[in-house]
Amino acid sequence: NYFNQTYESLVTEYSNRESVKTFYQVWESPIITAGGKELMNDIIELCSGENIFKDIDQIAPKVSLEAVIIANPEVIIGSGAGLTKPEWLNYWEIWPSLKAVSEEHVYFIPPDLVQRQTPRTLIGTKQMCEHIDKARVD
């Protein structure tokens, strides 16, 4: 079926590429991310990204700003709660020492495409892979 074909196509295209340190941000205050038990972690891994918080054994852990800075992600991807890029995603611009910021790899994916597990998750997965791939190419 279409879902399985699309999934297999994404696996074939992205799953064996060089790893990219990835920070996925769900919310601003507190900073909420995806831990190792969240589907988002699996999506990041499918894209050959490395979730910088994969070792946290929670679905949606709160993390500190310092932890993100220390991990120094190569790409930052946020979702928020609406269809447009949340203003708080621009906050990272004040941290030019972060590789994702200095190389302009801060992206938005609408939450309906990645935070609600439906067939549309494949659309969000493709966007995730494309964003991670941009950081890989640089």
Regions found by a protein language model. Give the residues of each.
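N-terminal ligand-binding lobe of clamshell/alpha-beta domains
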Residues: N1-D138
